Swiss-Prot record:
Record has Isomerase as a keyword: yes
Chain positions recorded as substrate binding sites: R22, G23, A24, G25, R65, S137, K138, A139, N214, K215, K240
Catalysed reactions, as listed in the record: alpha-D-ribose 1,5-bisphosphate = D-ribulose 1,5-bisphosphate
Keywords per UniProt: Carbohydrate metabolism, Isomerase
Note: Reaction proceeds via a cis-phosphoenolate intermediate.
Protein name: Ribose 1,5-bisphosphate isomerase
Length: 324
């Protein structure tokens, strides 16, 4: 008999895949919550049955977005603890409690991390700063919001972030806190860099050498910031650091549907020898980044390997906890 997976797991997976749930932190918390619901609603009669359900649920969630490492790191956080309990001979209710509690713990730590990043990062923002940001990052927003709450007179330049327009979400959120916002097209980033004091952006993944994988366009903004000698600050929780890159694995860049760029009706009328490429992310080299702000403090990009060893060193010794 196959594992009975609750509908919330499939719904969450679909929302992550379609980008209804977007942003590395929200994706991670949604994945942890889906595992929690699976454990809560499971009709399993034996520990092995629940363990198998959680493994299948993890695989369904894992296969949704290849680039956002926050997703597998959330699954690892929960499943590593559940696996230890299962192999230790836990009974059904203990196993269920371990899954639910681990998921709640991850979600709590994730939300607290954003607050802490805001507190740490705001110390690097000065009164009168004009800040440029890209896409929609809760961690990056936390830095700007905290600085504004401290009474610093800041203004934020927000790029539209084509083709999914995440910049609109960022602009409206910052404005709701009372922060003055300038909204620009992506291609105007270099034009307005000369009036920018600092760049603050988020990350989907951070590699062992300190490179940042984030929304397409991030590397161009970081490059033009370097050209103008403008500080680039990346705000990211430690669960966005990519453990597999310690072993040389390359991060897969997700290619999304062309209809996100050109509406399907219009695309049908285009000549067949035009291809529309739509990468969701790009890679910003560590030399274009000045600091990475984490909940554990501010580090230079080359110190990313130290965070990875401390946080995920155990992951190098084992296969994924949901693998057979």
């Amino acid at each position: 008999m196959g594992a009975m997976i609750v509908k919330e797991v499939y719904e969450t997976a679909e929302k992550i895949k379609s980008m209804e749930i977007r942003g590395a932190g929200r994706i991670a918390r949604a994945a942890a919550q889906a595992l929690m619901i699976q454990a809560e609603k499971s009709k399993a009669k034996e520990p092995e049955e629940l363990w198998n359900e959680l493994k299948v649920a993890s695989k369904i969630l894992y296969n949704t977005r290849p680039t956002a490492v926050s997703l597998p790191n959330a699954l690892r956080y929960v499943m590593h603890r559940v696996k230890a309990a299962y192999l230790g001979g836990a009974d059904l209710e203990t196993l269920r409690f371990t899954a639910i509690n681990s998921a709640k713990e991850f979600i709590y730590n994730s939300e607290k991390a954003i607050e802490r990043i805001g507190e740490i990062g705001a110390k690097r923002i000065e009164d009168g700063d004009i800040i440029m940001t890209h896409c929609h990052s809760k961690a990056a927003i936390s830095v700007m919001k905290k600085a504004f709450e401290q009474g610093k007179n800041i203004k934020v330049i927000v790029t539209e972030t084509r083709p999914k327009w995440q910049g609109k979400i960022t602009a409206k959120e910052l404005a709701s806190y009372g922060i003055p916002v300038i909204y620009i097209v992506d291609s105007a980033a270099r034009h307005y860099m000369k009036m920018t004091d600092k760049v603050v952006m988020g990350a989907d993944s951070i590699t062992a050498n300190g490179a940042v994988i984030n929304k397409i366009g991030t590397s161009l903004i970081a490059l033009t910031a370097k050209e103008h000698r403008v500080w680039v600050m990346i705000a990211a929780e430690t669960y966005k650091f990519h453990p597999a890159t310690m072993l040389g694995q390359l991060v897969e860049i997700e290619m999304r549907d062309p209809t996100e760029v050109i509406p399907e009706e219009e695309l049908r009328t285009w000549p067949k020898n035009i291809e529309v490429w739509n990468p969701a992310f790009d890679v910003t080299p560590p030399e274009y980044i000045d600091v990475i702000i984490t909940e554990r403090g501010i580090i230079p990009p080359y110190a990313a390997i130290d965070i990875l060893k401390e946080e995920f060193g155990w992951a190098l010794k084992y296969k994924e906890p949901w693998e057979d």
